[in-house]
């Protein structure tokens, strides 16, 4: 769909309207933007408009027009939401804050939680993701934006597909679900 920016906006508006006509009364929550750093400045992946500074704000403005009664969600992958976390100086936090300050109606903040790591590096890399203090730091920071938080697209692998691996996977899931849902912003 690469073209000039106005052409891309026209096609996006058309798509928003089509989705709203068909689903606005049936699907309550809409992810307006998803993984806005993925493919950043990669011409083979992203459309021209995707790289514009007002992409997020413009997208939420259009979504608000088409879905006035639905909940609008911003979503980001695990790297920007969790691994690159620096409190209110995190790029995802600042992106949301900027959009809100510019009047975007963002009803919910969503973060993905994929643990796609090789088995031999899994324990080392995921230590930060499974750390209760880190989880609460992330959730506390995003809660300061005054929106509820959702965790989406969750992946906790069972590497060997054995009963033991599945038990470990289940224990991790129980622990992180308990941490997430004990937070008041969830």
Task: Show which residues each predicted segment covers.
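Substrate-binding cleft of secreted/luminal carbohydrate-active enzymes
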Residues: 113-114, 150-154, 160, 167-186
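Structural preference for beta-strand elements that scaffold enzyme active sites
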Residues: 27-31, 69-73, 105-110, 148-151, ...
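Active-site cleft segment of glycoside hydrolase catalytic domains centered on the general acid/base Glu
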Residues: 2-94, 119-137, 160-172
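Aromatic-lined glycan-binding groove of carbohydrate-active enzymes
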Residues: 102-112, 138-155
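Structural recognition of alpha->loop->beta junctions
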Residues: 18-28, 95-108, 175-186
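Short loop/turn segments at strand-loop or loop-helix junctions that form parts
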Residues: 32-35, 76-77, 112-114, 152-155
């Amino acid at each position: 769909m690469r073209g000039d920016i106005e052409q891309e906006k026209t096609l996006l508006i058309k798509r928003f309207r089509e989705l709203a006509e068909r689903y606005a009364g049936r699907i309550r929550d809409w992810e307006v933007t998803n993984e806005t750093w993925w493919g950043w400045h990669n011409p083979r992946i992203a459309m021209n408009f995707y790289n514009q500074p007002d992409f997020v704000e413009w997208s939420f403005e259009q979504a608000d027009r088409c879905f006035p009664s639905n909940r609008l969600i911003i979503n980001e992958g695990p790297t920007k939401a969790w691994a690159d976390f620096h409190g209110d100086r995190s790029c995802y936090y600042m992106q949301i804050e900027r959009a809100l300050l510019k009047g975007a109606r963002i009803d919910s903040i969503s973060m993905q939680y994929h643990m796609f790591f090789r088995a031999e590096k899994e324990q080392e890399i995921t230590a930060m993701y499974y750390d209760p203090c880190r989880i609460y730091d992330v959730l506390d920071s995003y809660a300061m934006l005054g929106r509820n938080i959702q965790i989406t697209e969750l992946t906790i692998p069972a590497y060997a597909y054995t009963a033991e691996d599945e038990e470990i996977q289940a224990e991790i899931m129980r622990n992180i679900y308990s941490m997430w849902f004990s937070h008041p912003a969830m």
